[in-house]
Amino acid sequence: MEEGKITTASLPGEGKAPRDAYAGYIRRKRLLLVVLFVAVVGIAVFSMTMGSLQIAPADVVRAVFGQGDVRTVAAVQNIRLPRVLTAIVAGVALALAGCAYQSVLRNPLASASTLGISQGAAFGASLAIIIFAGGAGASAAYEGISTADPVTTALFAFAGAMLSTVVILLLSRVREMTPESIVLLGVALSALFTAGTTIVQYFAEDSQVAAVVFWTFGDLGRVSRSQLAVMALVTVVSAVFFFANRWAMNAIESGEGLAHSLGISVNGVRLANMLVASAAASTVIAFCGIVNFVGLVAPHVMRRVLGADYRFLLPASALAGAGMLLVSDILCHVVVSPLILPISAITSFVGAPIFIYLLFRGVSR
């Protein structure tokens, strides 16, 4: 064989090396996803063992399927399982939304909180509570709080969150803003909505202000089964949409120039992803209240572990978000038991140190 005709494929075993390396790459990513899934299931079962009625893990599993002691089945299916499912669905939705924001804006700081979506929801909820106070939505844990009907509050919170998204998208289209400018615009809107919430509270009665503050605490236990079904539906639709756009997100991650050369409408993908991500995040915030750091930290951590391949980053972020919210919910119940701490405070206490560590680790590199 002539020297000029020798190729890698003609050498024994050489043609298989890249293929084997790629297969190993895929296996490692899939193995991590399996580990994350098993961890989430384990945390969920452990979470349902805790409470005033201590239940063994095996009994929890049987109770989920309606088997075992009547009291145990009632405690698991009526109280603990809905709360755990709410934590999983909310964690998945917020993490997927954060992953999508960080992808299309190419900014690791993009999340529902930094884009003003959480603050817009708080403003909408404040209006609902103060305008329609006196309904049947008072919490049993806070006697004397005057609040609006939960459905009305959720609708106003959703409207406020989507208002922030619409303003960002409209202004970014008018001025052709860069992804960095969009995040800065979100920070400005956060301050604006926070100021609006403060002014609304200033003119409210004490009981109404207490209701607004209680709503912003965040609470997974106040989500009804019908609200959980709505959250789950929105989350599933959003997940399908994001996964269908995984290759476009990979292309944008490699550079907008490359994405354009592949025939991808970067602005169109950015618009669609932001709308779907905002719908998912807004739905969760409307029903659960403010839940900080899940949409920021979970995708950021998984990006450090897995890289920016959205075929694996999306499901990994979803599982990490579910796990983070489950762990936070457990801490809510055990830190100062029998009191239950606000979920937003615990997610911040859990997420902020992790994020600071990742930032310092990145700087040291």
Locate predicted features.
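Alpha-helical transmembrane segments in inner-membrane proteins
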Residues: 2-365
